[in-house]
């Protein structure tokens, strides 16, 4: 479902106060554009989610410390994703579409983490 703004009706009289089709119409309830800065806002627009990489299942992942074990944190991430997926199984059986979508995203995320764990295991086996 896509949103298309409704253009204002063209004015038939040349001197009327109604703006023409090319003129932007400011309204009291208009939504600010995410591309520019909004007057009174603290800073530029920042989305609340990240479209890059696997989904986070609604929790924020901690940054890895410089000396942290890569495989240990990947493995713990995988365990937490599996735990989150377990919470979505019963609502999915009950017919919840949102739980089904979260479960799908969790499966995709878990598969990516399993690939990372396997790659790490192979790297460790070579050394």
Swiss-Prot record:
Compositional bias of kind Low complexity: 9-44
Question: Subunit notes for this chain?
Answer: Component of the nucleosome remodeling and deacetylase (NuRD) repressor complex, composed of core proteins MTA1, MTA2, MTA3, RBBP4, RBBP7, HDAC1, HDAC2, MBD2, MBD3, and peripherally associated proteins CDK2AP1, CDK2AP2, GATAD2A, GATAD2B, CHD3, CHD4 and CHD5. The exact stoichiometry of the NuRD complex is unknown, and some subunits such as MBD2 and MBD3, GATAD2A and GATAD2B, and CHD3, CHD4 and CHD5 define mutually exclusive NuRD complexes. Interacts with CDK2AP1. Interacts with CDK2. Interacts with MAPK1.
Which keywords does this Swiss-Prot/TrEMBL entry list? Cytoplasm, Nucleus, Phosphoprotein
Biological process GO terms, please? negative regulation of G1/S transition of mitotic cell cycle; regulation of microtubule cytoskeleton organization; regulation of stem cell division
Is Ligase among the key words of this record? Answer: no
Mention any one GO cellular component term assigned to this protein in its UniProt record: cytoplasm
Function in brief: Acts as a component of the histone deacetylase NuRD complex which participates in the remodeling of chromatin. Inhibits cell cycle G1/S phase transition by repressing CDK2 expression and activation; represses CDK2 activation by inhibiting its interaction with cyclin E and A. Plays a role in regulating the self-renewal of embryonic stem cells (ESCs) and in maintaining cell survival during terminal differentiation of ESCs. Regulates microtubule organization of metaphase II oocytes.
Q: Name one Pfam family in it.
A: CDK2AP
Cell location = Cytoplasm; Nucleus
Q: Where is this region: Interaction with CDK2?
A: 65-107
**Would you indicate the residue range of the signal peptide?**
none
Which family is it part of?
Belongs to the CDK2AP family.
List the protein's name: Cyclin-dependent kinase 2-associated protein 2
Q: Which InterPro entries match?
A: DOC_1/2
Gene for this chain: CDK2AP2
KW Repressor (keyword) present: no
PTM summary from the entry reads: Phosphorylated by MAPK1 and CDK2.
Region Disordered, annotated ranges: 1-49
